[in-house]
Amino acid sequence: SVSLAAAGHPILAIPAAMAAGACAGFVTAFLQTKLGVPSILAGIVTNTGLYTINLMAMGWSSNVNLLKQETIFTKFRALNEFGGWYEFVLAALITVAAGAVLIWFLKTRLGLSIRATGDNRDMVKASSVNPVLTVTVGLCVSNALTGLAGAVVGQMQKSADINSGTGIVVIGLACLIIGETVVGKGSGLRGVLAVILGSVIYRFLYAV
C-alpha cells in the first residue's frame, strides 16, 4: 500500500493491499487443505515467504516513507470538513464500513458455513458442505481485512517498516480477549464489535 502510495496511487493502494492479503490467505489455505500442513505451521511458512515479498514490493528497502506524498488521509483533509479530526473520522468510517460488510457476509449461507467449520469441521462435512472451500474463503477474507488494516495504518503513519507486523498476532489475541470480556460472546455482530472495541481499549491502555 505504502509503495503504491509513494508511486502516486494512494486510493488504488487500498484494494491492491486487500488483494495481496487475500492471495496470502489462499496460499495458507492451500498449504493446509491440499498439502496437509498443520494450520500454525502453514501460517508461519506463508509469513516467512511474505517477508521477502514485502521487501521486494518496498524496493528492497526496510523502510518506505510518505512524508512528501499524497495519501487517502491528505485527500480527505482537503475536504476541510472535520478539522484536526480528519484522520480519526476517516479511519472510523473505514472501520465501520468493513465491519458492516463483514457482519452481512457472516449472515449469508457461505458465511454461516465458515462459522460452522470453525466450530465443527466434521459436522460441516457431513452436511454436504465442502470444508476446503469454507477454509479457503475464510482465510482469504480475513487476510484481505488484514491487508486493509495495514494499508490504512501505513498511509496514516506515512511510513511502512518491514518489521511493523512483529508481534501483531499476540496483540490481536489480546484485543479479542479484551473485547469479548466487555461485549461478551454470541452473534456475529457481537464478535465484530468485540474485535473493534477490544482494539480501541487495548490501544488506549497502551498509550496511557
Residue ranges and their predicted role:
Residues G8, L35-V37, T108, V129:
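Membrane-helix interface residues
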Residues S3, A7, F26, F30-K34, ...:
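Membrane-interface helix caps of multi-pass small-molecule transporters
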Residues P15-A16, A24, G83-V169:
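Helix-loop-helix "hairpin" substructures at the membrane interface of multi-pass membrane proteins
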